[in-house]
Design a protein with these regions (language model features):
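Rhodanese-like catalytic fold shared by cysteine-dependent sulfurtransferases
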Residues: 1-11, 15-148, 152-248
Length: 248
């Protein structure tokens, strides 16, 4: 609030999904879901002198968003806003409601290429494999392991129409993993629009949570011919029953 009053050179990025941002937000902030931040930051911040402040509703997603930008080598000073919108409200500061400031601008081709090279290096350093369609099918065909596949591009206007694939924004997949992935240490395949940045960003965080992560090098349309028809091996044993009388 003080920095805004002093008209400092800064931007406030809200790393939550649009639905949460729309409900309540910090005045002057822009909705940029966490996994989109490294992909879109260059369209908004043009000078390294601009301070970047990341907020959420509390603290977790602001820390994840800020650290993601730092990991990508952003030269600006990056801060995570302590206690987020809740702390703002408890400090007797006014929140905005029903705002629609969503950063939809896409980076240019040259910037996307730079970002792609950066994420490829980060994935290699963290031993996360970038795979093609055949490898995706091989992983799905392996009925000895649970494999999930997600489109992590944040898009509040549409959802995936491919059977077996869910659209979950990368930031939310990191924030609420147990809502979407039911098997600990399972395999997870991530993809986006082919830039690899959003899928790679999400994979880097999930790898730290002991999931076996892969990034698909391609777009959604290439996955329409995936075959999800396989048998699940599950052997059940009969349950021994006991009556109330036997318990006496």
């Amino acid at each position: 609030s003080q920095k805004q009053k002093e008209k400092k050179d800064l931007v406030i990025l809200d790393g939550r999904p649009f639905e949460e941002y729309n409900k309540m937000s910090i005045p002057g902030s822009i909705c940029v879901p966490n996994a989109e931040m490294p992909y879109k930051i260059s369209t908004l911040v043009k000078t390294p002198k601009t301070e970047i402040i990341v907020n959420c509703a509390g603290r977790t997603r602001s820390i994840i968003g800020a650290q993601t930008l730092i990991n990508f080598g952003v030269q600006n000073k990056v801060y995570a806003l302590e206690n987020g919108t809740q702390g703002w409200f408890l400090s007797n500061l006014n929140l905005d409601n029903n705002k629609t400031n969503y950063l939809e601008i896409e980076p240019n081709k040259n910037e996307i290429e730079k970002l792609r090279n950066k994420i490829i290096n980060l994935l290699e350093e963290n031993h996360i494999e970038i795979i093609d369609f055949l490898k995706v099918q091989d992983l799905i065909n392996d009925d000895t392991r649970s494999t999930y596949i997600f489109n992590v591009k944040a898009n509040f206007n549409s959802r995936n129409s491919i059977y077996g694939i869910r659209n979950v924004a990368g930031g939310q997949l990191v924030q609420a993993t147990d809502n979407h992935v039911g098997v600990l240490k399972s395999r997870i395949i991530f993809f986006d629009e082919g830039d690899l940045v959003r899928a790679g960003t999400t994979a880097l965080w999930l790898k730290k949570m002991n999931f076996e992560c892969y990034v698909f090098k391609g777009k959604e349309k290439k996955l329409r011919s995936l075959n999800f028809n396989h048998h699940i091996k599950f052997k059940s044993k009969s349950v021994n029953l006991i009556t109330f009388q036997d318990l006496k």
